[in-house]
């Protein structure tokens, strides 16, 4: 299967080590994966800010770059949801009569979803990852409710958590139980710009829950959430390292 790794803008600019870790994990697991040249933003920031035409042009480029691939593995639940929901409709709105947008949307998956659903937890465990720490797990809202990475607390169904299942394969890692496990971090992309006071309050509440349960590190599926929480934690001098799931699985988690 011909696969591509999509690296979100903020990961590319601020956390390239996370992209390298994800690529390392995929290659060790035998996934044939490219990081295409010419890859662009998924278009979500423009769309969320109300600049529809700019967002459409960006997602059209995304579709053109990734159309040849059978699987597009995205290092962000937020970006993955945007592509899955809007790639098809944007291309159709632009007058395209082919189904490239719909195909790209269908083939797009988030990194942890891909590992859990298509590679398999047993195979991931063969990586032999190890990290001694008490960790709090934060799943971004888009990944939780948009992609089904875990059961949201408001849904009365049998519990499941794909991210914890993957992290259970990391030797020495103890996952702590939070009082409000699926609480939003408060970032929300442009929400943090438009409503900074609310965003900060939500982030501090999230950190309070994490630290009160003795977590030594925070692990997440989304670096955008961790960027927000890390900024708040540094300002309050909490000494709380934060890592993407890929860094733990690759064995490259180091304090930043």
Q: Over which residues does each language-model region extend?
A:
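Iron-sulfur cluster-binding electron-transfer modules in prokaryotic oxidoreductases
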Residues: 1-256
